[in-house]
Amino acid sequence: METKVGKQKKRSVDSNDDVSKERRPKRAAACRNFKEKPLRISDKSETVEAKKEQNVVEEIVAIQLTSSLESNDDPRPNRRLTDFVLHNSDGVPQPVEMLELGDIFLEGVVLPLGDDKNEEKGVRFQSFGRVENWNISGYEDGSPGIWISTALADYDCRKPASKYKKIYDYFFEKACACVEVFKSLSKNPDTSLDELLAAVARSMSGSKIFSSGGAIQEFVISQGEFIYNQLAGLDETAKNHETCFVENSVLVSLRDHESSKIHKALSNVALRIDESQLVKSDHLVDGAEAEDVRYAKLIQEEEYRISMERSRNKRSSTTSASNKFYIKINEHEIANDYPLPSYYKNTKEETDELLLFEPGYEVDTRDLPCRTLHNWALYNSDSRMISLEVLPMRPCAEIDVTVFGSGVVAEDDGSGFCLDDSESSTSTQSNVHDGMNIFLSQIKEWMIEFGAEMIFVTLRTDMAWYRLGKPSKQYAPWFETVMKTVRVAISIFNMLMRESRVAKLSYANVIKRLCGLEENDKAYISSKLLDVERYVVVHGQIILQLFEEYPDKDIKRCPFVTGLASKMQDIHHTKWIIKRKKKILQKGKNLNPRAGLAHVVTRMKPMQATTTRLVNRIWGEFYSIYSPEVPSEAIHEVEEEEIEEDEEEDENEEDDIEEEAVEVQKSHTPKKSRGNSEDMEIKWNGEILGETSDGEPLYGRALVGGETVAVGSAVILEVDDPDETPAIYFVEFMFESSDQCKMLHGKLLQRGSETVIGTAANERELFLTNECLTVHLKDIKGTVSLDIRSRPWGHQYRKENLVVDKLDRARAEERKANGLPTEYYCKSLYSPERGGFFSLPRNDIGLGSGFCSSCKIKEEEEERSKTKLNISKTGVFSNGIEYYNGDFVYVLPNYITKDGLKKGTSRRTTLKCGRNVGLKAFVVCQLLDVIVLEESRKASNASFQVKLTRFYRPEDISEEKAYASDIQELYYSHDTYILPPEALQGKCEVRKKNDMPLCREYPILDHIFFCEVFYDSSTGYLKQFPANMKLKFSTIKDETLLREKKGKGVETGTSSGILMKPDEVPKEMRLATLDIFAGCGGLSHGLEKAGVSNTKWAIEYEEPAGHAFKQNHPEATVFVDNCNVILRAIMEKCGDVDDCVSTVEAAELVAKLDENQKSTLPLPGQADFISGGPPCQGFSGMNRFSDGSWSKVQCEMILAFLSFADYFRPKYFLLENVKKFVTYNKGRTFQLTMASLLEIGYQVRFGILEAGTYGVSQPRKRVIIWAASPEEVLPEWPEPMHVFDNPGSKISLPRGLHYDTVRNTKFGAPFRSITVRDTIGDLPLVENGESKINKEYRTTPVSWFQKKIRGNMSVLTDHICKGLNELNLIRCKKIPKRPGADWRDLPDENVTLSNGLVEKLRPLALSKTAKNHNEWKGLYGRLDWQGNLPISITDPQPMGKVGMCFHPEQDRIITVRECARSQGFPDSYEFSGTTKHKHRQIGNAVPPPLAFALGRKLKEALYLKSSLQHQS
């Protein structure tokens, strides 16, 4: 019988089969001669559908119940076994090896072999057998599999029962050892025993059974004979050219090796065994003596297993201090042993490590792959060289060090290599290494192994383990100190080993002996005692860790170790707590561990955020309450759900899945309250105030159980679910019903923890909602103290409000300490369906008049949701819009079945950046008539349909027509349709071309089209309107006045349809704006173009971006400085230093500002609007260093940003960021941001917008947070205008709800999506690496987009691109010029470069990992003329996260100008610095069209407030 590779199916093999046809049997040699009973299953046996875990008694029944079509052809059944136990006839669990001594039986669950996912086919049995033999498979796969055979079938053992796990795990480790030895010897049969043991120890280092690499080596030695027998048995089916294990000297050496440690562990075993009498385990030996020997050996094995288990338990319960703490290396003390600071410089293109491996979040480190790394270097996030020594060798909590690396990665061939200066005579490692250059993610830990003359260093990231080869020449001096320290430790080991008793050598003796070493000794430090001691102490943790891992406990506890540990504690080294849980977690770390030692000044030097005391208190209190025992960086753990790509979602994510309801359900009937069973006296207290609309008397006060309940107060109602917190309701009015019941109508007051701000909310703050209900007064459980809070608004009242709030908090703390009831307050209305917190409608609440605004809203919503005829039955109401004959309307495209020349356009959903191909805009029609169905004409709810005539769009004719035509142009036709009213999606206007607005802005935010051509769909011809054709166009209205609803399904708040020309906006309507984190100015440009903003000040940290901002906004004062310094300077200038929390460094930098800079600083009261986007790199999944301390500090920039809002108190505040901002840090940053703005006193609205729906050709989701003062109107969200398929804009809310900011445009929008060809099709040809800044256009603009984006420019700037290296340029030229072409289209061949090197044309790393990474779609990809551009990133490259960056027809990366156009920047916009700087400025910018859309809505809010003031 043979076993296929790994865990594949097994099959029976006749004795006369030619075994040489198989490469190698993948089974053990042990127990081959147990009698096998072949079973022939009748062909007539039927497959029986099994339910989950049926219980059976007979094995043959279980085999039949778990049969499958795949297994019916197998001569011998193969099944999968889980939750199993091997036991003797008495039911006592037994190790697998005990099969040699007696009968062993099985119990567990049997499943079909190949159906891993369908567990419902499992059949449970209590006892099968007996077991005839066992086998080990998976040698060539590198993953051991255990097979157990009965007389009837073979079983693949997958998962043991929990009670059997410890016993089985030991045997499984033996199988692992066999496979690892097989792998190592197959790759290098001539390896030395030391190398073999080291290689196996490394590969098994993740095992939970063994405490160290030394323990693994001991285990492998102890199993030498077992391993030898398994591998020797493989020789019987090996081919001539394959490794012969029987005579392999290393394997024989392993078999015969004696381990004193094992003998010591087995000293309590009474039997002594003469090894010479032992026989191989693959033969049964007759006779009592042989049986005794076999029995004694198995008993020894079991005793050893038990002793290991006891040892593990003892270690875990009596952990020494050295195992609890890791002493941190002090950088200042070791600085003199390292070179002067220098920076890593990469000369070759490097690939992100994350592209090579499957991310392993919450994965045990033993499951990570092992690779080798050559020509490597280590550095921090500033690219400054850093020693591996500063990173702990154990997983520790509260680590403030971050190390990254680069090098050449290659497959681990299993052979060891010496990192010492002189090559070991036993080392067989080749000096030539093939692989690819990569940069690593954060390095989490590292370890050192040594044996004989060899030293091995291995490090771990979250992706893989890396065995280090030789470092790069640049980094070698940094690694030399680490190697020297290891040599010193080895020298000390040798000293101790030479002593008869290790206790003879004290710490002082060892130091003296080190002083006496010869200068040519590799462990030589100095001849001076003080120098030697200093070196040993400051680098002591490496030495201590090596001693900790040493298997000899006498050496581990020798006087030298205790003396060294004492010395290190005496100099007060910091201790890190060692973490026991080996799970992969991503945490924020300090990217600058050697910043204090550097002589090089860097602008990337971290600085703690400058804050006001209010913002500092809110964030500080939160973390002190919710994370008192959690290390600071644990706050920044990133859950798996947060690893989603911020920018580029999977192209196929939701292609065929219709989205669930995306809007928050508007619940106005809260959970039913539970009545009070107690008898209470309830009576009215006061006179009747009036009547309800039903004539019921209204009262202002009532006595309920002795407590006074008044209109405008708050009461507690208990809900049905006893586990829920009792609900609090605001009393709107009270009345007595017609059946004499005393009633209350109230609105739910929601606790902050039940809103989107969650645990960041103040426990005393309640939020009014529109959820209302009517209850009996007897249902009231009590009253609560509620203050409808109001504070005067403005920066001038800030200090006064702080004093009042401080006293209020002190009073609340005192009441809490004295056990008094909580006093609540309310100052905002929470509306989850509108995504925000709004000022209380104080004039409409607590009136006691019988009116409830929430009931009114509910009635209006119900009315709007109805589809019905108007009174005259000549018009239609649908989704709140009234349609009349002659109106121009939008129709969902899927209702138009006849589609002219464009039938059944297929979507390129499988192609990267082809998400929008095939998606259609709304069909524009004119309503001709409302057809009432005859059978329902007399009914009140008559059924009806609408008759429409269709307009065609250019894209309905052809792609060429769409490209060359105006996006607002329509073609009239005679095609008519009769459709249900549900097909209508809003109203629009169709005008004559001459009646179009003179100033047609980009992006389009108006629902206006023009028509001057007739389209005959029967012939496909376009022609001018016939003279007799009568088309009634839209009536032109005064665009400065309010207009009726213009095509939106639902409109609220400021969505009043106001049309305003930017150049006519009065000066007083433009807000004086401060742009923080301004970048090159994308946000400011869009807001200014909308006519709402006048950017007077900007703060930007990076000089090239600041220069670009100044070029494009010459009237603005631009501060190229740290915003923390600027805020400190402003607060100093205003005399508010006491309210400023900042670093000494910030204060020192403020002192260096000149008087001219200080005189131009903005002051509170001068800025009406603050906008900006705090650096997103820490939040973005696109950022390579997102776990580092600089990103952590950047994330804290949100505190400085919020502090600007607190100190200035502008009318409006706008925060934009990447989508991941909502979920980053488990949502806490998002929640605290909104909690801070609410505490300041703002109204707040939150949402996620897709820039692609506002007229750019790329997917780019942005989180937007609006804040408006209590006196202003919060802007509504701009309506998405372009078709774009990019799902995933929902924000999770409590109670399982989701908020979707705007409607999804996948199924229709007013206009089509902007394509790649629309965007860049007119730009001239350029070559790879083009660097000429100014060029001629050479052609006129063709598409509507090109005309708008080019404007009046006559000179093309920044049409420059990065240069591809020689290999990538060859690859680029080989990529076919067609949609969807990428690296997979490269021929599988080698190319010879100009330097003579031979390289693979297809990237090797992609080929090997494609199966697990969606084929790496898009890498080295060409853009599709009809698709969209990929997300604009700061550094386009073919192997990056966004790898589709090749021009559709030219052999190069897309240019700076092409990237700028993809973001919506006009060609007149200038960028500054190098090509890399310009890409960075564009990639970090807010798309101006999105900013324009936001600005238009802000302007509407300002006009609405103005109109309301005029009305009042």
Curated annotation (Swiss-Prot):
Pfam family, one: BAH
EC number: 2.1.1.37
Catalysed reaction, written as an equation: a 2'-deoxycytidine in DNA + S-adenosyl-L-methionine = a 5-methyl-2'-deoxycytidine in DNA + S-adenosyl-L-homocysteine + H(+)
Residues passing through the membrane, by range: none
SMART domains: BAH
Active site (UniProt): C1176
Subcellular location per the Swiss-Prot or TrEMBL entry: Nucleus
Entry's Gene Ontology BP terms: DNA methylation-dependent constitutive heterochromatin formation; methylation
Name of the protein: DNA (cytosine-5)-methyltransferase 2
